[in-house]
Amino acid sequence: MKTLVASILSLAVAAVLGSAAFAQEATPANGAAPAHHEEGATPHYPLKEPKEEEWSFAGPFGHYDKAQLQRGLKVYTEVCSACHSMNLVPFRMLDELGYNQAQVKAFAANYEVQDGPNAAGEMFTRKAVPSDHFPAPFANAEAAAASNNGAAPPDFSLIAKAREVERGFPQFVFDVFTQYQENGPDYIHALLTGYEEPPAGFQVPQGGHYNPYFHAAAVLAMPKPLSDGQVTYDDGAPQTVDQYSKDVSSFLMWAAEPHLEERKRTGFMVMIFLAIFTVLIYLTKRSVYANKDH
């Protein structure tokens, strides 16, 4: 029996090492997939895998950096909100970013929302209040598509959880132990910073933009949205595309999972409870069966 178990474990270890070696051989040193594919072969998107970035909210003890979230809100407000909605995020939640009620109320008042009907049965517009949600920039999906090369920009409420690149074997096995859950922010950052010139011989359709990090194709309708110095920061943070991308990715992660910190604290306490409970069960078992004949 011991020999059989040892053989199974040896085969498992060999399979893991073999898969890792195969993955290393199949992927270039920079982590990018080949830009060209054999004729007739179906390309695998994204053409380049997103790089794992450093995030304050990563790991079992991760937490949101409020200063970064405030910068990300500024990037979203001044750049992204022109095309992308956040229909599921109410203004009142901005107090979790470190703003007081007066600041949240003033921020919401910068927007107008549709309300009604009034006593005359007509719809009307009014200034937003903290209980309102971020308004959409377009009246409907058709209007959004007509203004963006035929592709309606997705809502950003849950984009950090909805957009991610699948990690193959054996990476997804290791992710269980490293608690890697930042696929979405890594993808968003890679996409925003990944615009580049297409390789020789690659034809970009009219109205398209080459980005090897796009999850569905090599070309997308959205032009490069960020440039250095585009958004002014008041806290002295670098005003670069890389920093903008990290900040807005963090903000979108918060929008998608605002209770992340509470979830991680609860999970840690549950693990402590289970550890103590396991010890108590073991000691109880030893006490009960201490004088029993086996």
Write out the residue ranges for each language-model feature.
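Acidic, low-complexity proline/glycine-rich segments
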Residues: 24-53
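Extended, hydrophilic extramembrane loops/domains of integral membrane proteins
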Residues: 214-257
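Electrostatic cytochrome c docking/interface patches
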Residues: 39, 47-74, 85-99, 103-104, ...
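C-type cytochrome heme c attachment motif
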Residues: 74-85, 132-139, 152-161, 190, ...
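Bacterial N-terminal signal peptides
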Residues: 7-16
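Acidic, glycine-rich loop-and-strand cores that form catalytic or ligand-binding grooves
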Residues: 151, 155-209
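Sec/Tat signal peptide C-region and signal peptidase I cleavage site
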Residues: 17-23
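Juxtamembrane interface at the cytosolic side of transmembrane helices
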Residues: 263-294
